[in-house]
Amino acid sequence: MTKVHFRSYIHKKMILFPQRIDKDIAEDDPVRLLDALVDNLMLDNVYKLYKPSGRKPYHPQMMLKVILYAYMNNIYSCRRIESLLKRDIHFIYLAGYEQPDFITINRFRNRVKKEINNIFTQVVLILAAKGLISLDVEYIDGTKIESKANKYTFVWKRTVEKNRAKLQEQIRTLLLQVDDVIAQDNAAKTEGIEFTAALLDEISKELNKSLESAPEPKTKEEKQAVRTKKKQLKELENKRNKLQEYDQHLEIMGERNSYSKTDPDATFMHMKEDAMRNGQTKPGYNLQIATENQFITNFALYANRTDTLTLSSFLESFKSRYHRYAKTVVADSGYGSEENYLFMDIHNMEAYVKYNYFHKEQRPRYTPNPFSPASLYYNKEQDFYVCPMGQHMKRIGLKRSLTSNGFVTYSVRYQAERCDGCPLRGSCFKARGNRIIEVNHQLQHYKQKARELLTSEEGIKHRGRRCIEPEAVFGQTKYNKAYKRFRHFGKDKVNMDFAFFAIAFNIGKMCRKTNLKELKAVMELLLVTFRCFIQVYIGYLKPNKSFYMKLAA
């Protein structure tokens, strides 16, 4: 029988000369591109977070590389990163054989939570310098991501206000029952006013003094009266504590309608994932992102459930990040409001933003309602509408409305004449008297402008791209990257965690669209100019306004 010869296998052999750690890593591996990219980031503000005294900390560059590479590979657990630093060659290469534990990794993330946004901005500017994005267009969309908090930790504003009102009446009734002179005087003073914890504390102190200065009870009835007073005093103190609790709930909530006890920054919202199909609300955040070529160029977290109230502040955050507004904004009908259209008009943005019923209007079989105000003939010069029967609807007044965001809208009211006996009345309207319509002319103007933009050749192109821009990024985020729920408590930590994710997401996509040689060539050409460019944007330097305008052009 022929002898089989195997390759030499001595797994415990010693090597005379140490080998390079990256010997077995491919030249075009994403870990090399990440390594080169982080080496060229400006981390001066991160270095300032460390104290010169004490034990030498791990290098921030190494920590940043390790965490970003973990996020690129769907690894978000610090314990898992600690484990991979001991056995994964890519992590060992980035760490240079350093092995920080999970506590150190988590502390680093918390340490840089205020500076990670600057690092995200630098990475986006590298993408712009590479020509992968232009920062001239924003494809905007939002999604709700569940918080780490439990879904049964809710506090509802309406419930708190209702119980607080009941408590006020209970306190007023209790004060009337106290037969002490001081309590009666205070009850008279507080008749019809709202009680506060400070006022109840003052009343309790006076009642305590009254009980202490009272003579020693001798008879059975006197002792019973003292016990009753003490019981009432104890009840008053309990109600004071409850009032403090309600006031604290309302202070934490602010303008919101709810919050979570374990994550006060989270608001209860309806999520898309509803396994029970009962419309149950869960604590979460409204995540807004802007994309271009499926790169995340901006992001922000909001407590508002609706996207309409977030657009203007989100566009402002883009300006604060890059010192200029985007030239073009593309969004769905959830953002089409008068306030948002006005904001984009003031700042000279092309608003490819849909409004309600836009898709319905574009259907081939769509026929507009002949009785709706939008279908009626309007004489702009004399300011009147004409109903389907030819009757003039004259202007009768102006209605002022205030949105939940504090924006003031004005609607003009028009009233028809002689609606009694009209053969079309049953189809036109069913209220008594003559028909009254309300028309917001400014909103109608912006809708017409948006309709012209959206149905143009450029608008059709943007509408087609919007479906594959933020929607695709959300799909990759939730399903390919398994980033369906935040893993931290508090808005600042949640913002930090998503900033790490967004940086890793952009670098991963960059790796698929470029190679290491191209990146190094760009880095060598732009090393001097680009570092100054980055310094200006993240606030290290303070140049004049003309220099900003030149960079933003």
What do the predicted segments below correspond to?
Residues 1-32:
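Hydrophobic alpha-helical membrane-insertion signals
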Residues 3, 50-54, 458-461:
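A ubiquitous short alpha-helical element
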Residues 7-8, 67, 74-87, 98-553:
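Anion-binding and metal-coordination hotspots
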Residues 26, 54-62, 73, 77, ...:
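Generic, well-ordered alpha-helical segments
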Residues 26-68, 441:
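Basic, short loop/linker segments at the boundary and entry of helix-turn-helix/winged-helix-like folds
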Residues 91-96:
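Secretory-pathway/luminal and periplasmic proteins that interact with or process carbohydrate-rich
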